[in-house]
Amino acid sequence: MAPTAAAGLAARDASGHLSPLTISRRSTGDDDVVIKILYCGICHSDLHSIKNEWKNATYPLVPGHEIAGVVTEAGKNVTKFKGGDKVGVGCMVNSCHSCDSCNQGLENHCPGVIFTYNSVDKDGTVTYGGYSSMVVVHERFVVRFPEAMPLDKGAPLLCAGITVYSPMKYHGLNVPSKHVGVLGLGGLGHVAVKFAKAFGMTVTVISSSPGKRQEALERLGADAFVVSKNADEMNAATGTMDGIINTVSANIPIAPLLGLLKPNGKMILVGLPEKPMEIPPFALVASNKTLAGSCIGGMADTEMIDLAAKHGVTAEIEVIGADYVNTAMERLAKADVRYRFVIDIGNTLKDAIE
């Protein structure tokens, strides 16, 4: 089959302004799945990428790696999916399939990983993301949606969800007897709270915004709330947490936060501050604490979507039309969203382009 034309929304330069673009999707390979995109979440990474804040953008750039839709075609070797299946695609669309990382289901660490957008595909072309009408993906990187999982509220789990689920699983912060802190209550943080409660853990939200206390406790189900700028509250929480999932992308003092951990406690970074972080060695060494990082998750971690469906874990979203996407980006830059924008691709992309 010949390549297929698809509708997309692309940034042409570092202004980040998104406008219609007709893109080409590769012909369907024997191992490929073709997906009609119905929803795509807006991740903060999309904003960084379209504005070239990470200095690696290739324009035109079509962002989006929180994709949900339905299968319209499957290659002859595909065994897991058929037409009509509800599916999603996260941050990756392919890898080498043969390295140690791939063999362990850790494709996110494959030296040859191909990301969903702004990455070089195996044919040398640049990948385009989910702000588009359809996508062609190797079946290994397609996630089946359980019937109980709505596509719009489930789409953000393919990035935000896996980003917090994977380190909680890997670092043992998924045990009912443990106490986890969630630093930051945004797109990542609110999902981390929900997963931690699904694991049966005690959850404390740590935030610089006192106004989020009621939201955290009453709407999201956190057990406690600590204002990071309140010395009394921070002192009261000192040494109480087994781990902290740090979702904040701002540059903040790390030593007071490490003080909240018990001896042998772990802080896992999933947010990416623009500037280097100052690490206080004594705060780690004295109580045998660990500071670690985590980058999304491998395909083995997509069991996350089944656990989410079982426990009713979904993202809190604001569904928008494709013609609102630039306004949404402006609002996202100001943290003016509770908690994730999701573009209604299926119903609005065509109208926005025409």
From Swiss-Prot:
* Cofactor remark: Binds 2 Zn(2+) ions per subunit.
Q: Which residues bind Zn(2+) 1?
A: C43, H65, E66, C159
Catalyzed chemical reaction(s): (E)-cinnamyl alcohol + NADP(+) = (E)-cinnamaldehyde + NADPH + H(+); (E)-coniferol + NADP(+) = (E)-coniferaldehyde + NADPH + H(+); (E)-sinapyl alcohol + NADP(+) = (E)-sinapaldehyde + NADPH + H(+); (E)-4-coumaroyl alcohol + NADP(+) = (E)-4-coumaraldehyde + NADPH + H(+)
Cite the entry's keywords alphabetically.
Lignin biosynthesis, Metal-binding, NADP, Oxidoreductase, Zinc
GO process annotations (BP): lignin biosynthetic process
Q: Which pathway, metabolic or otherwise, does it act in?
A: Aromatic compound metabolism; phenylpropanoid biosynthesis
UniProt-listed InterPro entries: ADH-like_C, ADH-like_N, ADH_Zn_CS, CAD-like, GroES-like_sf, NAD(P)-bd_dom_sf, PKS_ER
Binding-site list for NADP(+): 45, 163, 184-189, 207-212, 247, 271, 294-296
Q: Where does Zn(2+) 2 bind?
A: C96, C99, C102, C110
Give a single Pfam family match: ADH_zinc_N
According to its UniProt record, which cofactors does this protein need? Zn(2+)
Asked if the record carries the keyword Zinc, the reply is yes
UniProt keyword annotation of Ribosomal protein present: no
Could you tell me the EC number(s) of this protein? 1.1.1.195
Assigned protein family: Belongs to the zinc-containing alcohol dehydrogenase family.
Q: How does it assemble?
A: Homodimer.
Would you tell me the protein name for this molecule? Answer: Probable cinnamyl alcohol dehydrogenase 5
Query: Per UniProt, what is the name of the gene that codes for the protein in this document?
Result: CAD5
